[in-house]
Design a protein with these regions (language model features):
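Structured aminoacyl-transfer and RNA-binding surfaces used for tRNA recognition/handling
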Residues: 4-169
């Protein structure tokens, strides 16, 4: 029987994610709508979007995802095409993302980002398989904080102090 050595570190990069997933004849971004398509798949934008790979990536250590990121779209025409595939109209794209589309007129270098889950790294270093073991203020499985019993009701004095007017249905 092959048993995993808990003292060994086995990192791997996950790449070539699909750019889109399709549900009920509608496309959705698998990562986010600003993830760049793989350069070798650009020609599929107008014919087979479901076959496009993204320039997204995750880093996994011993089966736990530690972080992820992507190379971002830096070309206005590609971004507009992605919005169109996602069913975002030109008007909606202009309203929500006009600042970005306008910025592309002036040029944008290829760029990307990545975020690590520091708590996940600490969990592995601590030899635990439960992230709650290493989070400073963990919540219970029902999302209750044992430190301050939140979420909880806010009394009338607190509502007044904060300028809140809570209406019930």
């Amino acid at each position: 029987m092959c048993i995993r050595d808990r003292n060994s570190w086995k990192p791997l990069w996950v790449v070539d994610f699909p750019l889109f997933e399709k549900e009920n004849d509608q496309y959705f971004s698998l990562h986010h709508p600003f993830t760049s398509p793989h350069p070798n798949d650009i020609e599929l934008l107008n014919s087979k979007p479901e076959n496009i790979r993204s320039l997204g990536y995750d880093i996994v250590m011993n089966g736990y995802e530690l972080g992820g990121g992507s190379i971002r779209i830096h070309d206005r025409k590609i971004q507009e095409n992605i919005f169109n595939i996602l069913g975002i109209s030109k008007d909606e794209a202009k309203e929500k993302f006009g600042f970005l589309l306008d910025a592309f007129k002036y040029g944008a270098p290829p760029h990307g980002g990545m975020a690590f889950g520091f708590d996940r790294i600490v969990m592995l270093l601590a030899g635990s398989n439960q992230i709650r073991d290493v989070i400073a203020f963990p919540k219970t499985t029902s999302a209750t904080s044992l430190m301050d019993n939140s979420p909880s009701n806010v009394d009338k004095a607190q509502q007044d102090e904060l300028g809140l007017d809570i209406k019930s249905n």
